[in-house]
Amino acid sequence: FSALNLEKLYISSNSFKIYDNVILHYNGNDINLFYNYFCNILSKAIIKFYEPLKIKQELNKNFFYFNHFEKEQILEIFDNELENQTNSLVLNRFTAIYKSLLNYINEGHHSVIFNGFCNFRLSSYNAILDCLLSNCVNRFLLEREYLEFINLLKLYISSNSPKESTIHLIYLKTNSILLDDNKQIIDIKHSDLLNAKFLSDITFSDNDYILNYLLNALPAQLIIHIPNLSYFQDEFLNTLRLIFENRVCICTDCVI
């Protein structure tokens, strides 16, 4: 509060055994400006100091069945999500606190007990945190299931011999094309190697059949041709790289 550039604002503080007391005494004419500054600063303080403790508390209380390492992963996902400026929940955190503080002051209160206010007067803000945390837990579970499935497929591939020497994938996001070792188009929907057992496990829209074919063909080498570099970090391609590992070769500049 000492950085506030307001005339006739007097600040004092006292430290007691279990808490610190900050007193703001404003004798200026623009009380609304003072309230704005006050709510702004305290809202930022709540996000900086209270929020990390609240999230850990809720994680230990409501998701106690995760071990320490798993909780740390969830917290990492949560911290990363706070950087997402397109998430309306993330953006609404500050506003929810600010409005609660302003309403509290307008009710005629002249003091704010920090812990009590955070625990009992921030229902909207705490609901946002609960929703964010639940979303992050769900994302963690999906990522864990995804990695477990990838590991199963890697084990399956490593324990079976290749049925094809080389397969080319011309990746177009939709309507991608598979070519055999002679660079002839593979009709995957009518191939003898098509086996629907993998289609129910993982879905990538139009790439379902391609993934299914590759998991049955088990090529010794998978050459992926990417005509558009923006596809390089595509989820489906990342999955293929994880599954087939050193069998994958990426081509970005050939004419096929």
What do the predicted segments below correspond to?
Residues 69-125:
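Hydrophobic alpha-helical segments and helix pairs
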Residues 25-27, 170-172, 251:
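A structural detector for beta-sheet-dominated domains
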Residues 23, 175-178, 222:
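Hydrophobic residues embedded in beta-strands of well-ordered beta-sheets
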Residues 1-74:
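An N-terminal, globular interaction/scaffold subdomain
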Residues 182-256:
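C-terminal structured domains
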Residues 101-207:
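A contiguous, surface-oriented mixed alpha/beta subdomain in the mid-to-C-terminal portion of proteins
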